[in-house]
């Protein structure tokens, strides 16, 4: 009974976590390239 809920939570968190890491890395990359000139 708990497995479907756990699978749903994991499947919902994985894309959000990956998106958050991607956005953070992208912002850091843009900031670094902007400061580097």
From Swiss-Prot:
Lineage: Bacteria, Bacillati, Cyanobacteriota, Cyanophyceae, Synechococcales
Name the UniProt record assigns to this protein: Cytochrome b6-f complex subunit 5
One GO CC term on file: plasma membrane-derived thylakoid membrane
Listed transmembrane segments: 5-25
GO biological process: cytochrome complex assembly; photosynthesis
Keywords in alphabetical order: Electron transport, Membrane, Photosynthesis, Thylakoid, Transmembrane, Transmembrane helix, Transport
Membrane topology category: Single-pass membrane protein
Family as reported in the entry's similarity comment: Belongs to the PetG family.
Location of this chain's protein in the cell: Cellular thylakoid membrane
Subunit structure: The 4 large subunits of the cytochrome b6-f complex are cytochrome b6, subunit IV (17 kDa polypeptide, PetD), cytochrome f and the Rieske protein, while the 4 small subunits are PetG, PetL, PetM and PetN. The complex functions as a dimer.
HAMAP family in alphabetical order: Cytb6_f_PetG
Function (record text): Component of the cytochrome b6-f complex, which mediates electron transfer between photosystem II (PSII) and photosystem I (PSI), cyclic electron flow around PSI, and state transitions. PetG is required for either the stability or assembly of the cytochrome b6-f complex.
Molecular function via GO: electron transporter, transferring electrons within cytochrome b6/f complex of photosystem II activity
């Amino acid at each position: 009974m708990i497995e479907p809920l756990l699978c749903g939570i994991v499947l919902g968190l994985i894309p959000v976590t990956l998106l958050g890491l991607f956005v953070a890395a992208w912002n850091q990359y843009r900031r670094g390239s902007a400061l580097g000139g």
